[in-house]
């Protein structure tokens, strides 16, 4: 692999052993996939920060890194953790042991020592981070959160491979990643197109199910091209989360949304019918009265909070008291300033910052609990943990509670 003089200096340990080791990892992975050079990144986002996800082994790894003097060389942010840092008991039906609290606290301490910005969200694109870092279309980053990776490539035109948590961590320390995959303009040109014949604009749950279909069908190494009407930011967010959870796609070129020229390399066109999508929606619809109405996977946007308030205002108190919203601390503060938090709490809604039902102890101890959500990703992961999950858009959720 070709290295610049600066990269050779880093690898030789002139900027510390920790940064040299991090760059060595990036180089070895790059060589394994055939990358010919490295590129600088402007930002890293580390996934796998929850103790429920990485356990004691992950804690020891991060603690050793911090003790070795490892420091992030580019702005680096962090995914959600096991609980709301300021209100640990915020997640309902969840037993949070002192051991989990202590271990999670040590993980955060190690990441903070390395210079991480503890925004603790899976939606860094909703925070002030892109503006603060100066991220623009075409910039390269190293993100580890699958839903954010798909959103960055497909909606924002920011370039990132789907990095594992440790690799995003190493990229943040090294300040480099390998030139391959989503960083290569040629790779970003689709060869297979999917066209959905539909009489309507898709809401976020339909978009999520469409994401499942695309992710499980697509086999080409290049990203697919999608021609389908996705209705607004929630639909784009849930679609991105679905293609990242049901499969391993890092990007879908969405007609009319994704920046940049998709090129003219299409070799195959797959036509899909809305009826097939509707039948899958029926399979996933709640056939029960839920114990929890859940919004915010990935973390909720301000627009979703507004929609939720309008929907709950028309429903009874019972629906509000069963509603849980997970959200980034950054957007929670914005919603607080707009009066949305007070309005929703007045209806009984519970907020969970810094965390979510998936990466908290809830997902391992909620067997038998019934959850209705607008998120395909929440359905995908919670149903694997023995939770009964049904899918419905925000406007339909309160109507499920009698």
Swiss-Prot record:
Q: Some GO term, biological process aspect, for this entry: which one?
A: isoprenoid biosynthetic process
Give start-end of the signal peptide: none
Q: Which domain of life is it from?
A: Archaea
UniProt keyword annotations, A-Z = 4Fe-4S, Iron, Iron-sulfur, Isoprene biosynthesis, Lyase, Metal-binding
State which pathway it belongs to: Isoprenoid biosynthesis; isopentenyl diphosphate biosynthesis via mevalonate pathway
Q: What is one Pfam family matched by this protein?
A: AcnX
**Which is an annotated GO molecular function term of this record?**
lyase activity
Q: How is the cofactor bound?
A: Binds 1 [4Fe-4S] cluster per subunit.
| Protein purpose | Component of a hydro-lyase that catalyzes the dehydration of mevalonate 5-phosphate (MVA5P) to form trans-anhydromevalonate 5-phosphate (tAHMP). Involved in the archaeal mevalonate (MVA) pathway, which provides fundamental precursors for isoprenoid biosynthesis, such as isopentenyl diphosphate (IPP) and dimethylallyl diphosphate (DMAPP).
Subunit composition?
Heterodimer composed of a large subunit (PMDh-L) and a small subunit (PMDh-S).
* Name of the protein in its database record: Phosphomevalonate dehydratase large subunit
Q: Which organism is it from?
A: Aeropyrum pernix (strain ATCC 700893 / DSM 11879 / JCM 9820 / NBRC 100138 / K1)
Lineage per the UniProt record: Archaea, Thermoproteota, Thermoprotei, Desulfurococcales, Desulfurococcaceae
